[in-house]
Amino acid sequence: MKLLVVIDMQNDFIDGSLGSDAAKAIVPNVVKKIEEASKDTVIIFTKDTHFSDYDCTLEGKLLPVKHCLYNSDGWCINDAVRSAWIKDGIIEVNDAEFREDNTIIKTTFGSTQLMNFLAREGHNFKEIEFCGLCTDICVVSNVLMARAALPDMRITGDSSFCAGTTPEAHNAALTVMRSCQINVI
């Protein structure tokens, strides 16, 4: 069995307050990845989630751009990505209420909930693949946490299924992943 972890494919990171052309460009790739996932692939999404106190958090002070505010349009998974998931019968139609076992709500870059899940259930998977946004922030954070939880697991990150805050930051994150024995393609 394989695990596909789709990191933060949310509106605010694609065409919202922190969106970019690079993020928009990977949407069709991520959609295709979900649609082509085999029946023995478990798909988990993460959703970056902030609240009205965002400005008071360290992230809010260092990145003063409100994004992914709980239950806002920017917080929702991109429609095309969501539709690929729904079409496969994996989730309920209501975006705000993804099935708990397939979505991880996280309030920071890396998810300890994902890491704990991997430490507990990782032995059930032959491989873990990551895709999503942003390569140099949330993707690399979660990939490295997965490596810590599962030091002997084959973990893959496909560079065409991720986008960074800049091309340079994207490439730097891929270099870090390779250094930590992540299969980067």
Region roles according to the model:
Residues 1-103, 126, 152-156, 165-179, ...:
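Active-site acidic carboxylates
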Residues 103-141, 163-185:
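Conserved N-terminal glycine/acidic-rich loop preference
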